[in-house]
A protein has these predicted regions:
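Helix-biased detector of long, well-ordered alpha-helical tracts
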Residues: 1-167
């Protein structure tokens, strides 16, 4: 069962009374009255990144991937919350310095503000990122039509090439 089937079969009915949730199938929460746009993503070691040898690259990947949900909706990400889970050895002082430096670089590059988060201890590394932006409207996934233009920035498939070469 893929992500969309799982949502439809088990969780979509729980959001029926919340039009801002977009039936849980549009990657963001959008409250038009408050102009609030929110996305949440989780990244797990062994699934979204093979290991934690290069914490700085993992952080760059997860920040950029997380803000892309808002950017794809035509919204500038402004704030983010990050929660991390990992062992003491994986969250060593050396790795924490790399994580902090990488977060700082990404914040400057994309004009983001860290606004909170959480940490916990576990043997595998996992991060959850919540991104927040504000807009009067968004580009909705279900509004795409035949013959609409699609624009791509960067290199297509660069993520998989990087993944295969660096990890």
């Amino acid at each position: 069962m893929d992500e969309f089937e799982l949502i439809k079969n088990y969780f979509q009915k729980n959001s029926n009374n919340n039009p801002s949730a977009k039936n849980l199938n549009d990657d963001v929460f959008f409250n038009k009255n408050r102009r609030l746009v929110v996305s949440v993503d989780t990244y797990n070691e062994g699934v979204h990144f093979p290991d934690f040898k290069y914490p700085n690259l993992v952080i760059k990947k997860i920040i950029r991937s997380s803000i892309s949900d808002l950017i794809a909706k035509g919204v500038k990400p402004e704030y983010y919350f990050i929660s991390g889970c990992g062992s003491k050895s994986k969250f060593s002082k050396k790795n924490l310095k790399m994580i902090s430096k990488s977060l700082n670089q990404e914040q400057k590059k994309y004009d983001l503000k860290l606004s909170g988060g959480d940490t916990t201890n576990f043997n595998k590394v996992s991060f959850s990122i919540t991104c927040i932006g504000f807009s009067k409207k968004i580009v909705e996934r279900n509004k795409a039509r035949l013959n609409d233009d699609i624009y791509v920035t960067g290199n297509i498939n660069f993520c998989i090439i990087s993944f295969n070469n660096f990890f």
